[in-house]
Amino acid sequence: MEQTADQPVTGQVAEAMTAEHESLSLECRADPARFERLLAPDFHEFGASGGEIGYPGTAAQVAAATDPEGEPIRVENMRGWLLADGLVMLKYTSEIQGRRANRTSLWRRTASGRWQIFHHQGTITAR
């Protein structure tokens, strides 16, 4: 069942959305250790260039590209689906320094109950 930010979001979808928003906060992105805790060991991303990025070095790359005093990442139309117990897909549009992208993330709950992202894709879109 789809849950959106315009409606009451509950349960695991709400937990995954909280984790996604954390991963997008400048404070988290500027802190490699904090950001890395949100990444699953098998994390991979298809970036805007079409290249695939894996877990090693991702947190350091994100931190190096983040200005903690910069403009926050804007998020629009976030919605989520509980695919299975402990597995959530999120879709939304982001805007970073005037660049918009459609994004999809897959989040998995660990045995300890923490949420980690294991797949992300961002596709640049026209305004």
What does each model-identified segment do?
Residues 87-88, 115:
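Hydrophobic residues embedded in beta-strands of well-ordered beta-sheets
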Residues 73-76, 89, 99-104:
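Short, surface-exposed coil-to-beta transition loops
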Residues 1-7:
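Juxtamembrane and targeting peptides
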Residues 13-14, 26-86:
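A solvent-exposed, acidic/Ser-Thr-rich amphipathic alpha-helical stretch
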Residues 39, 94-96, 121-124:
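Short beta-strand segments enriched in hydrophobic/aromatic residues
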Residues 100-127:
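Short beta-strand edge/turn micro-motifs at domain boundaries
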